């Protein structure tokens, strides 16, 4: 009788204890995933990508930053090398995802070292078949097609996608930084509108800052070439990203930003 009494009362108590414990377990933090090229992540010091410092502007006790960008990659090679599959294996509902490319896509798509990164221009459904050295066939798509894939795949996992226009280069013409309004920046905006992704016009926001700095001061942000910034330039671009996020009416990623 004593054994039956214990089982009868201890088992319900154990169930209640487990339920209470589960209720107090903190839910996992959302993750802010970032993919891009060397303007976002760059280990070749003194060069530095904005994704390496953007965590300074977020409350990382409430959100995690996962910078999956890789130098030298394009929208095409980020997928073909399996890097996108890696992101998709961990991204979950409620996470945020930002994609920013545009620097490595310009070569004509072929099987050469540079051509392997190239994509077709525009946002259409055009394709080009390439026979690789191992005999495999690769179907190359437009820049817009690759952006749509990123957005649609992220949405399918319940993540919130954001497209950003490419980081501007240190290229001035008539006293103004050359914008990407006629190609990769334009196509990024069009795909964002087409897919319902949020859009941050990073190219314009940072270009406006460079215009104010002028060519001489802007040059100080670019050690060695006209594409890759130092840490000061990276922080300018990171600030531009957060400024763009604050402009997005319904994107709650901005709720995780540290107050100005």
Q: Residue spans of the language-model regions?
A:
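Short, solvent-exposed loop/turn segments at secondary-structure boundaries
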Residues: 44-46, 78-79, 174-179
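Short glycine-rich, polar/acidic loop-and-turn segments at beta strand-coil junctions
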Residues: 69-72, 103-105
């Amino acid at each position: 009788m004593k054994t039956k009494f214990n089982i009868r009362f201890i088992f319900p108590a154990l169930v209640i204890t487990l339920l209470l414990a589960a209720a107090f377990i903190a839910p996992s933090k959302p993750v802010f995933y970032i993919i891009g090229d060397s303007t976002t992540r760059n280990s070749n010091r003194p060069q530095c990508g904005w994704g390496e410092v953007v965590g300074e502007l977020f409350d990382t006790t409430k959100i995690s930053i996962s910078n999956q960008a890789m130098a030298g990659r394009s929208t095409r090679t980020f997928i073909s090398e399996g890097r996108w599959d890696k992101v998709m294996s961990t991204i979950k509902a409620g996470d945020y995802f930002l994609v920013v490319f545009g620097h490595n896509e310009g070569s004509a798509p072929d099987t050469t070292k540079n051509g392997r990164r190239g994509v077709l221009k525009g946002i259409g459904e055009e394709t080009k078949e390439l026979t690789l050295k191992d005999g495999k066939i690769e179907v190359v798509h437009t820049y817009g097609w690759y952006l749509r894939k990123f957005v649609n795949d992220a949405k399918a996992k319940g993540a919130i996608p954001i497209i950003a226009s490419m980081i501007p280069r240190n290229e001035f013409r008539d006293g103004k930084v050359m914008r990407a309004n006629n190609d990769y920046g334009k196509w990024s905006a069009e795909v964002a509108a087409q897919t319902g992704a949020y859009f941050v016009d990073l190219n314009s926001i940072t270009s406006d800052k460079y215009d104010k700095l002028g060519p001489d001061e802007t040059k100080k942000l670019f050690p060695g070439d006209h594409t890759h910034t130092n840490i000061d330039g990276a922080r300018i671009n990171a600030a531009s990203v957060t400024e763009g996020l604050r402009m997005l009416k319904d994107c709650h990623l901005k709720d995780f930003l540290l107050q100005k």
